[in-house]
Design a protein with these regions (language model features):
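A short helix->loop->beta-strand "cap" motif at the edges of active sites that frequently abuts
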Residues: 154-161, 236-240
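Short catalytic helix/loop segments, enriched in acidic residues and glycine
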Residues: 21-40
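Conserved phosphate/ATP/ADP-binding segment of small-molecule kinases
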Residues: 172-264
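Hydrophobic beta-strand scaffold residues
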Residues: 50, 76, 162-163, 194
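Conserved N-terminal subdomain of the carbohydrate kinase-like
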Residues: 49-136, 332-346
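Alpha-helix C-terminal capping segments
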Residues: 38-49, 295-299
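Positively charged, low-complexity intrinsically disordered leader regions
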Residues: 1-21
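Conserved post-catalytic alpha-helical subdomain immediately downstream of the catalytic base
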Residues: 252, 268-339
């Protein structure tokens, strides 16, 4: 069984019930979520050994979060404790022409005050096959960025494959450095890079030539994105695979979804899914990443199948409430075979 380590921040998610706006809500629905933790949950669901690493405060909310992760089979034995609080994010789910809104309350969280040397990465990576991080973590604080680099360098030294989701969040970079300043050194240590057209442009100034996926409602011309992939590989020669997710947003409840994968001079394109009646798109990219890691580990000689698994897994996530993608390998494979009818399974 392959062992995957993920590192980042997990937060308390407080969502308005249904489609209520913040000013209408009299209560909030509490769950947990965070990019790297969401990936770990997906991988545990698929039967891999998944360990999530973070810094927790010592309080009952953190203990509840840990128990929640354990309930999905995610290990937390390498987590460290200290700091003041668990971060929080508030979610207002959009509908039709009204987009969803997220308000963060994560300043001074435990991971925001993490420092190099607090985590023994040599021990964390014992027996590990894969390490995953996202661009959200180095955006939190200089300390979080330093520890992320520390982890990547240890993984490289120990022969552990490294993946990243660029995941650019402009509102998080508040500690005096920009993503363009910090990310290149981190991404240079990655074997697999995932992003979208906005990530590539905002962080590295790389654009698809003459194509805007948002203007075409998700009609994907894969060749237009080959230039993004080749430019990323030229900038980061360690990378063996570059993957671009392609989301077309017709409205808040109706998206198109697909992706392309570039490796060894070949560009693979997934089927394009038309996702109507979205239940919850938060965690959609994380479910793609979880599916991709599983696919690349399970189908090492079949990049097309790995990509198709990632897209199908993420498509199913859009039907599930909460950050986590709670589906099985069999359910994903059924959708890959074309079984998207939604009929009762007996």
């Amino acid at each position: 069984m392959a062992k995957v380590i993920t590192f980042g921040e997990i937060m308390l998610r407080l969502a308005t019930p249904g489609y209520l706006r913040f000013n209408q809500a009299k209560q909030f629905e509490a769950t947990f979520g965070g990019g790297e933790a969401n990936v770990a949950v997906s991988l545990a669901n698929y039967g891999l050994e998944a360990e999530f690493v973070t810094r927790f405060p010592k309080n009952d909310i953190a203990e509840s979060c840990i128990k929640d992760l354990h309930s999905y089979g995610v290990g937390t034995k390498h987590c460290v404790f200290g700091g003041e609080r668990l971060g929080i994010y508030f979610l207002e789910t959009g509908a039709v022409a009204r987009p969803s809104k997220v308000v963060y309350d994560r300043a001074h969280s435990s991971i925001a005050t993490i420092e190099k040397g607090m985590i023994d990465w040599e021990k964390v990576f014992e027996g590990a096959d894969w390490f995953h991080w996202t661009g959200i973590t180095p955006a939190i604080s200089q300390g979080a960025a330093d520890v992320c680099l520390e982890a990547i360098q240890a993984a490289n030294r120990l022969g552990v494959k490294v993946s990243c989701d660029l995941n650019y969040r402009k509102n998080l970079w508040k500690y005096g450095k920009t993503a363009s300043e910090v990310m290149p050194e981190l991404v240079a240590g990655c074997d697999v890079i995932l992003g979208n057209e906005e990530d590539a442009e905002k962080v590295f100034g790389i654009k698809p030539e003459g194509f805007d996926v948002t203007a075409t409602h998700g009609e994907v011309n894969a060749a237009e994105f080959e230039s993004v992939c080749t430019q990323l590989m030229a900038k980061f020669p360690r990378a063996q695979k570059v993957i671009i997710t392609l989301r077309g947003s017709i409205n808040a409840n109706h998206n198109t979804w697909g992706g392309v994968l570039y490796s060894n001079g070949t560009l693979y394109q997934s089927p394009r899914y038309d996702i109507t009646h979205i239940v919850d798109r938060v965690g959609g990219g994380d479910s793609f990443m979880g599916g991709l890691i599983y696919g690349l580990i399970s189908y090492p000689e079949d990049d097309q199948k790995a990509l198709n698994f990632a897209v199908a897994a993420s498509c199913l996530k859009h039907t599930i409430y909460g950050d986590y993608n709670q589906v099985t390998v069999a359910e994903v494979e059924n959708l890959m075979k074309g079984d998207g009818s939604g009929r009762v399974s007996r």
